[in-house]
């Protein structure tokens, strides 16, 4: 199962923040409605002077600012977030958002487990004790694309060998090493000619493209996706990516749940070679 779309063609509303926000719009890229059982992926916006009331969630959340400026309020602190800043918010932590600038602010938001179950997973409250065991209610960082290493094969992820990946670089910016337990959020970049061959996973992946264009093979469909496009691949859905352009392509990618310690990907070519060995 897979899904793809374009941000400008995706409907916007306040979603679960209706009545608890002003100047807030959310474009849902991935959620239960398209078949996901693990994650919600959203591009959200706050108009100048807009705000989202204090609340807490029964899921983990990460926000990556695309443009504009956000005031993030969490655990009694206020953080100013600008383009390419990102924040991880632990489950059960009260937080709020404001746009105190004179321009709209936009960000990518990933939440897991997938919101909208039988549990009341978003609660609006001005304050609440931290959950037991939470030492860092939220964490903030800045991503600098210039700090990415040179593209290569393998990309540093378990099971992604050089025969199946080339001209690529990936950096996990939110994951187990930064306090998240439910998902990985990555920045991925392919040089011209960069590729990953046909494969699947035991986890879902979501993609939001920031720069350039890529040929995406999703199941039996092949499409060219560009900045502002997005796609999603379910557990067991075969997919491949190739940069056939003359420029770099870069995107934000989610992996939900976090991948296993081994066999993070099953590559078609690897398996076909294995079963073709003499004696099989």
Residue ranges and their predicted role:
Residues 42-44, 110, 185-188, 197, ...:
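A structural feature that tracks compact, well-ordered secondary-structure segments
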Residues 62, 88, 102-121, 232, ...:
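A short hydrophobic beta-strand segment most commonly corresponding to one strand
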Residues 76-91, 220-236:
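Short acidic-glycine-tyrosine-enriched beta hairpin
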Residues 59-70, 75, 203-215, 219:
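Glycine- and acidic-residue-biased ligand/ion/polar-headgroup-sensing regions
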Residues 23-27, 42-57, 186-201:
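Conserved short histidine dyad/triad with adjacent acidic residue
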Residues 1-38, 118-182, 266-280:
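A short, N-terminal "cap"/entry segment at the start of jelly-roll beta-barrel domains
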Residues 98-101, 242-244:
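Asparagine-centered strand-capping/turn motif at beta-strand->loop junctions
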């Amino acid at each position: 199962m897979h899904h793809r779309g374009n941000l400008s063609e995706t409907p916007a509303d306040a979603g679960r923040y209706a009545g608890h926000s002003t100047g807030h719009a959310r474009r849902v890229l991935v959620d239960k409605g398209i078949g996901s059982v693990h994650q919600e992926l959203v591009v959200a916006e706050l108009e100048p002077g807009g705000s989202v009331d204090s609340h807490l969630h029964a899921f983990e959340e990460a926000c990556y600012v695309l443009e504009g400026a956000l005031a993030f309020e969490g655990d009694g602190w206020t953080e100013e977030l600008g383009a390419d800043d990102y924040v991880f918010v632990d489950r059960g932590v009260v937080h709020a958002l404001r746009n105190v600038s004179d321009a709209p602010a936009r960000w990518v938001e990933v939440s897991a487990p997938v919101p909208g179950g039988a549990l009341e997973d978003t609660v609006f409250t001005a304050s609440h004790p931290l959950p037991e065991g939470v030492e860092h209610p939220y964490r903030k960082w800045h991503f600098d694309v210039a700090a990415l290493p040179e593209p290569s094969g393998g990309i540093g992820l378990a099971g992604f060998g050089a025969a199946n990946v080339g001209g690529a670089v990936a950096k996990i910016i939110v994951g187990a090493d930064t306090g998240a337990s439910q998902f990985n959020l990555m920045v991925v970049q392919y040089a011209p000619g960069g590729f990953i061959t046909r494969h699947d996973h035991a986890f879902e992946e979501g993609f939001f493209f920031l720069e350039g264009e890529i040929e995406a093979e999703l199941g039996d469909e092949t499409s060219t996706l560009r900045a502002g496009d997005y796609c999603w691949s379910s557990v067991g859905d075969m997919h491949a990516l190739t940069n056939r352009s003359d420029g770099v392509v870069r995107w934000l990618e989610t992996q939900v749940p976090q991948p296993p310690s081994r066999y993070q990907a099953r590559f078609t070519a690897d398996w076909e070679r294995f079963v073709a060995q003499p004696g099989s």
